[in-house]
């Protein structure tokens, strides 16, 4: 019996010729990612368990990208970044993207591939549930807690259960009004918020192959919103072009076998999918955008690991060019590379920065997670009361963007931009 | 016979980690003892306002060693702060219809609490304040007021890990690591 791409990557990392869903195996870890929220606790576990003088298993396997609480006066947040700094120094870690320096990047899941730390066929763990993003480049990647991460720091290994695979085949061409966010929100709406619990979500088909790497990241990023262990897309020429621009390290691309067995397969035709939203308070609360035009909005938000990439801002700018927003519209580029892109990229001779300013958006924030997860009181874009927010982020739980009373509608950057102009939920089709 | 007895706190489906420990408290580091205790005092404070407070204002711990939940408890972020906040607030066990994968694993890895699963939809039958007794070895629990006994799914290999106090303690005890 053949194996899926997820099974084959895990088999290689476990040194086994074959394995299947449900097997518990020790895998060798290529990359451990951590950030300012979970890094200090992970370091605490590492020293408590392996001793004050312990050394990490492989300094170049550890990547530390502070991103959550950066632009805040909160003293503990600063202390936490200091804890990372002294650990990096003590251990001689080469990959640390330090706030306040030229190496600072921003949101870890966009920064990790940008900086060349994601390669096809590798095994990546991160102390953040959206680590599943990196399956977009054909790697096995999943989120873990501090204790497991502390174990990896000391040993470079982790015991994991091989997930079953759910396959999603998206065929056809992608209409200009449809984005990756619409595809993944529809899938989550169909299978439910726990519809992929403990499973790998494999995305395949012609429409997936047509997507850019950034759009593929948007899809894999939200596998966790259906409870998935990992999201994954087989690598292709686009993947190799992206990776080879950013990493010199050799890698071995891994593909599923033709006769691999999956738990279920769903097929979609991209041409029939619609711009949509996820209504409060779970990402599986699917509705088409046009069926929710009566929902009045108080603000719009474009940012985060799933919705703050350059392609997301380019999409929003297509709609905002020559128009005005009617509600406060907050913009947070995920990384410094994205922020530079906003200055560099132009549509009809106008930079994205200029387009957003002319449209009346709020001043663009420096790159970080910002209000995607609420954060400390002084966080840019944080909700304060019962605002209705339309957002390109990935979670609409109660209180996720700050106030428990606020209501969050998740949507693609096109839908968010059209809604920011309309002041209510709007289908972007009429704006393109 | 190992048992856990006490009052239950009842929640419903899809209780995510932002409700268990809201993001503004993630600046606290769980391996620092005072901050571990602080996390406990904020446990479940992100629940919608119709829920009663889990930990009373000014208190370090709650009155409820057992949480009864519906489906998909602990969904959302991978923050280990979530099972830790519950453990620090005095929770010894959660009984849910199902868990999000990372929460279940973190609960076991940290040894903070027993994540029991039950085939019954107890969040409709029990109310906050009811007293129950869990019998870990028999994999069931009894509602003290009515005498009703409900089955729990066997924890299997997970039970000794939680009992030891987490994966590191367990791995040392059983000789997996030095
Ligand atoms: S941008 Fe949001 S979802 Fe992404 S890592 Fe930051 S807090 Fe998490």
Regions found by a protein language model. Name each.
Chain B
Residues 1-4, 36, 127, 145:
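A generic structural signal for short, non-catalytic loop/turn and secondary-structure boundary residues
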Residues 1-33, 169-178:
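N-terminal, positively charged, Ser/Thr/Ala/Gly-biased leader segments
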Residues 10, 26-138:
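Feature captures the catalytic cores and cofactor-binding loops of soluble hydro-lyases/lyases
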Residues 15-16, 74-81, 162-172:
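Conserved phosphate/anionic-ligand binding catalytic regions in large, soluble enzymes, centered on
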Residues 20, 43, 152:
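Short clusters of hydrophobic/aromatic residues that line enzyme substrate/ligand-binding pockets
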Residues 22, 100, 155-156:
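Generic structural signal for alpha-helix starts
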Residues 108-178:
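Acidic, glycine-rich flexible loop/linker segments
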